[in-house]
């Protein structure tokens, strides 16, 4: 039997549902999610393998007009995938009109010479007439290989989209073992799960100012628990106070919620210790960006 494989990038503006889609396809959490824009900062692979095929999805940071060095890193990480994939899924929301951000991405896609499938997400939020108008508007902007409306949250049409990708795969190698679901190490996934809880529980400027560093992660032979020490980095003392909360209540809540997700992922009991440190303006310092896991050399 012929084995087929290929690489598929998921591109789009922030908050259009790229990570929700990837997690639904994979059947488990690979990429963190929140209602905050620019939640995804790194490229994250989701490796979907059957006995006949392997589709390597690359979830990318939302493309936006960058205002910091971190923003530059995120946008470059997204666009760099155009050089390394066989197909692009360009995801747009059904419930928002086409904007300047979409037009900017479309111009880059036209120049990339890669087959592009338009994925219109969040169809559960709109009337069919609005959906048809949205599809017609985007259809006039460029020549898409396919146009597929979906609801990543509810799963509508997601399997159909995967089938379309499968039909267009070419004969190729199995790049990853069948039990590997992502390219990122466990430490990265743990740091992202902690950051997700910070995003979920805080507001205003804090989400964009947070990075999480895993200081150590090892099994304690006496308790048979995975002992994790993590530092939450922020840019200002006021942000540190908010994350710690009154009497440490917010930090305790972040740790408790993150620990449950980490235990599900690792399949082990976890002892999680968290600290909060201030590193002023880290998002604009390239050395700090690399220390916190945002290194262009890896992309």
From Swiss-Prot:
Keywords: Cell membrane, Cytoplasm, GTP-binding, Membrane, Nucleotide-binding, Ribosome biogenesis, RNA-binding, rRNA-binding. Residues 59-62 are annotated as: G3. Residues 150-152 are annotated as: G5. It is found in: Cytoplasm; Cell membrane. Residues 4-171 form the Era-type G domain. Gene3D superfamilies: 3.30.300.20, P-loop containing nucleotide triphosphate hydrolases (3.40.50.300). One of its GO terms (molecular function) is GTPase activity. Transmembrane segments: none annotated. Residues 12-19 are annotated as: G1. Residues 202-280 form the KH type-2 domain. It is a peripheral membrane protein. One of its GO terms (biological process) is ribosomal small subunit assembly. It comes from the Bacteria. Pfam families: KH_2, MMR_HSR1. HAMAP family: GTPase_Era. Belongs to the TRAFAC class TrmE-Era-EngA-EngB-Septin-like GTPase superfamily. Era GTPase family. Monomer. An essential GTPase that binds both GDP and GTP, with rapid nucleotide exchange. Plays a role in 16S rRNA processing and 30S ribosomal subunit biogenesis and possibly also in cell cycle regulation and energy metabolism. This is GTPase Era. It comes from Streptococcus gordonii (strain Challis / ATCC 35105 / BCRC 15272 / CH1 / DL1 / V288).
